Curated annotation (Swiss-Prot):
Mitochondrial membrane ATP synthase (F(1)F(0) ATP synthase or Complex V) produces ATP from ADP in the presence of a proton gradient across the membrane which is generated by electron transport complexes of the respiratory chain. F-type ATPases consist of two structural domains, F(1) - containing the extramembraneous catalytic core and F(0) - containing the membrane proton channel, linked together by a central stalk and a peripheral stalk. During catalysis, ATP synthesis in the catalytic domain of F(1) is coupled via a rotary mechanism of the central stalk subunits to proton translocation. Keywords: CF(0), Hydrogen ion transport, Ion transport, Lipid-binding, Membrane, Mitochondrion, Transit peptide, Transmembrane, Transmembrane helix, Transport. It comes from the Eukaryota. It is a multi-pass membrane protein. GO terms for cellular component: mitochondrial membrane; proton-transporting ATP synthase complex; proton-transporting two-sector ATPase complex, proton-transporting domain. InterPro entries: ATP_synth_F0_csu (IPR000454), ATP_synth_F0_csu_DDCD_BS (IPR020537), ATP_synth_F0_csu_sf (IPR038662), ATPase_proteolipid_c-like_dom (IPR002379), F/V-ATP_Csub_sf (IPR035921). GO terms for biological process: proton motive force-driven ATP synthesis. This is ATP synthase subunit 9, mitochondrial. Residues 1-66 form a transit peptide. Belongs to the ATPase C chain family. It comes from Neurospora crassa (strain ATCC 24698 / 74-OR23-1A / CBS 708.71 / DSM 1257 / FGSC 987). Its main location: mitochondrion. The gene is oli. It is found in: Mitochondrion membrane.
Amino acid sequence: MASTRVLASRLASQMAASAKVARPAVRVAQVSKRTIQTGSPLQTLKRTQMTSIVNATTRQAFQKRAYSSEIAQAMVEVSKNLGMGSAAIGLTGAGIGIGLVFAALLNGVARNPALRGQLFSYAILGFAFVEAIGLFDLMVALMAKFT
């Protein structure tokens, strides 16, 4: 609590001393008041130490951390790669689906060779649906990586 009061009063006095809108008479009065007061060397040392601590604290409070952007960028890249990998797992499902469609075609033609043309057209239609799902999954995976 006391450190907050010290920080606030110190910042206010620094702003008043460095403000361009302050009248020169006010600044002279503040400077002369400080120069007239004399204290022991210990008090002067404490005052300069406190000023340096306050300045360091305010600098640290408003300073941007150098490593935060690098960590954030690395986390974004890891997330993109995980998203692409997770979405690419769906491509194996499309490959399995295409294999099952043509396995069913071969099984159907083996059971009833007379329906070969009709079964082949249904197999091509099933292949197109499964491939569309696979391409959609690939598109999602690439969007997760490159956007």
